[in-house]
């Protein structure tokens, strides 16, 4: 209940600010801040019950039809990623790239990002908590109609993690 109240207050405070941003008179129908904030609020509520422990992430990743999605850059993905993950770099997420990569919107998708790991900073450079790639990826997938998305929750030491990692960089 506290989360819902906080979410409602956030929306009530942020949406008017976002709407006021268009007072400049510079219209762009391809950019919709109020719509983004609305979808982000919906996605935030949806996400709360979909954050996984390391053990649940591993178990679910082994189930047929599950896709592990790494939305980091292709370069960082090639340096080190969770075994079995596919790469679709966040800036490249579009209707068409999702249609090619994840044609069935009901596919179970597991996501992770830089902020899930310590001990391999060159491959998983930490972002500010409010700019975590998990947040952006979750909201983006939700915006495109993907609702069967789960997120690796904890911060893990890569050297102690039970996840298997692979590299394609030859380093």
Protein language model annotation of sequence segments:
Residues 19-48, 78-82, 86-88, 93-171:
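Rhodanese-like catalytic fold shared by cysteine-dependent sulfurtransferases
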Residues 67-72, 85-88:
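Short hydrophobic beta-strand that contains or immediately precedes a catalytic carboxylate
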Residues 1-4:
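Positively charged n-region of N-terminal signal peptides that target proteins for export
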Residues 46-60:
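A short, well-structured juxtamembrane/interface segment
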Residues 56, 72, 136:
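Short Gly/charged-rich anion-binding patches and loops
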Residues 59, 76-79:
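Short, solvent-exposed loop/turn elements at domain surfaces
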Residues 64-69, 105-108:
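Short coil/turn segments at beta-strand junctions that form active-site/ligand-binding loops
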Residues 7-15:
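Bacterial N-terminal signal peptides
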């Amino acid at each position: 209940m506290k989360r819902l109240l906080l979410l409602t207050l956030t929306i009530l405070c942020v949406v008017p600010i976002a709407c006021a941003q268009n007072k400049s008179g510079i219209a762009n129908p391809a950019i919709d801040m109020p719509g983004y904030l609305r979808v982000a609020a919906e996605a935030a509520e949806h996400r709360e019950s979909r954050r996984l422990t390391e053990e649940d992430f591993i178990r679910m990743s082994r189930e047929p039809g599950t896709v592990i999605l790494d939305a980091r850059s292709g370069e960082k993905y090639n340096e080190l990623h969770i075994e079995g993950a596919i790469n679709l770099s966040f800036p490249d997420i579009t209707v068409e790239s999702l249609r090619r990569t994840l044609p069935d919107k009901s596919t179970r998708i597991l996501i992770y990002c830089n902020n899930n790991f310590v001990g391999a900073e060159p491959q998983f450079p930490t972002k500010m908590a409010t700019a975590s790639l998990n947040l952006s990826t979750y909201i983006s997938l939700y915006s495109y109609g993907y609702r069967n998305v789960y997120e690796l929750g904890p911060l893990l030491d890569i050297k102690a993690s039970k996840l298997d990692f692979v590299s394609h960089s030859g380093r």
